[in-house]
Structure formats: C-alpha cells, structure tokens
C-alpha cells in the first residue's frame, strides 16, 4: 500500500510482504514506512551498517542491544529508539524480539533495505 494515489489504506499483517531480513512491510506512504520485526530469534549482531534512512522504533516484547558507533543501548518492552540516517549500527537480539519501526524515507523502496554486505 502506498500513499502515492492519494487514498487511505490498510495493510493486514497476515498479508504483509516479508523482506530478506525477516521484516514484515506494513503501511507505507511516499515519505515514511512501517515494518514489523516479529519474534526475531536470539542472534549476535551483524556487522555495523549505515542506512540512507532514519529509523524510529518501539519494542513490543523481548530484548535487544542496539550498537551504534560508540554507543550501546539495551532495549526492552516499552522502549523506543532513534537511529539517524547515515549512522553505522547493528542489533544483537538477546531474547525473542518483536518491534515496530518507522523509516523515512521508506526503507523498502529503491533497494534501501537490502541486508548489509
């Protein structure tokens, strides 16, 4: 669903497409998009990568550690976070993790959401 046609819309999670890293693409407009990380399993952080988009997120359940350049933030239920565009970062999943993120510009367009090399 995209805002480009001037219509309001809805994306049901059961029909949302899934990205290469396990994210579910939710509602998206021309300037912002939402995605869901649902029950992501425990994992060590991947190599840090910088993205062209800004990310804000909210933890629904589970725990993760966000490493961004010289910072480490522990995230748990009810926490929210911000990763500015261009900041190198990674997530270490400490406990099965569910979170909702919004990205601007939309991460799922123009190959911006590809897994880090």
Can you annotate each of these PLM segments?
Residues 1-36, 40, 46-47, 116-117:
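A short, N-terminal "cap"/entry segment at the start of jelly-roll beta-barrel domains
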Residues 30, 67-71, 94:
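Short strand-coil-strand connectors
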Residues 30, 43, 79, 87, ...:
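Surface-exposed loop/turn positions
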Residues 39, 51-66:
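Short, conserved beta-strand element in jelly-roll/cupin
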Residues 63-65, 72, 88, 98:
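Structural motif
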Residues 70-85:
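Short acidic-glycine-tyrosine-enriched beta hairpin
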Residues 85-109:
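Ligand-binding loop in jelly-roll beta-barrel domains
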Residues 108-117:
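Short, charged, intrinsically disordered terminal tails
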């Amino acid at each position: 669903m995209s805002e480009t046609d001037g219509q309001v819309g809805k994306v049901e999670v059961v029909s949302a497409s899934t990205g290469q890293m396990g994210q579910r693409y939710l509602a998206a407009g021309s300037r912002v998009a939402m995605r869901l990380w649902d029950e992501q399993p425990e994992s060590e952080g991947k190599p840090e990568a910088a993205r062209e988009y800004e990310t804000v997120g909210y933890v629904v359940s589970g725990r993760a550690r966000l490493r961004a350049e010289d910072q480490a933030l522990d995230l748990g239920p009810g926490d929210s976070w911000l990763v500015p565009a261009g900041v190198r970062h990674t997530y270490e999943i400490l406990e099965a993790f569910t979170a909702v993120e919004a990205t601007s510009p939309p991460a799922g367009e123009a190959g911006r959401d590809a897994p880090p090399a």
